[in-house]
Amino acid sequence: MKKKVLITGITGMVGSHLADKLIKKTDWQIYGLCRWRSPLYNVNHLLDLVNKKNSRLKFLYADLNDYSSLIKALEISKPDYIYHLAAQSFPLTSFEEANSTFNTNFIGTYNLLNAVKLLKQKPYIHVCSSSEVFGKVKKEDLPINENCHYHPASPYAISKVGTDLVGKYFYEAFGMKVLITRMFTHTGPRRGDVFAESSFAKQIALIEAKKIKPFINVGNLKSLRTFADVRDAVEAYYLLLTKNPKPGA
């Protein structure tokens, strides 16, 4: 029987690349969870497929903070796999919108996993946390690994610590098949220009087109960052749930 997968946050950079990967690599029925107000520019290239009759890619409109819509989406999709990628993912925004960041990232993750539990579904669930949970790391503690302590430095990072703990709770308390990742910064095509490397690239392109003065606005260039190409990241996420998955890891 054909496998079914639900991708939350399919209209985001990572979700759209994961959809691309699964369309090419599998014969699965793919369901993408998106909000009614979600911009679709990252998935414009997929809309023709979505609109086809009996398409293997379907969008389900729901909100992580609306139980009835989550329940309906899960009842329709009956997923074998869930990739939970939906999040408010910009740390700077989280300082200005802490409540909505917590509601989406922390409470939203709880709502999704609890809805799965209430329906007694048994999918493998990838909960996408973030390396931001480690925050400021001392030089002597490098390189970072899974045993590093939480040291969040933003409301976003705090929300992802909550996401981590929610995933662990549902695994330990109810035996749900949850796997958690703390990937470092994703970069690549479709990366928003509010993020550093995309902002630099955009400014350079505008300078070369003589549309702005030859001056690049930057932030703190002394911080050390680890980047992962989004196409490598979604390959890792695919393998996480399909190649000897180990819930609780």
PLM region descriptions:
Residues M1-H186:
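N-terminal Rossmann-like NAD(P)+-binding domain of SDR-like oxidoreductases, especially those catalyzing
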Residues V137-P143, L165-L241:
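NAD(P)-dependent short-chain dehydrogenase/reductase
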Residues N244-A249:
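Short, intrinsically disordered, charge-balanced linker/junction segments flanking boundaries
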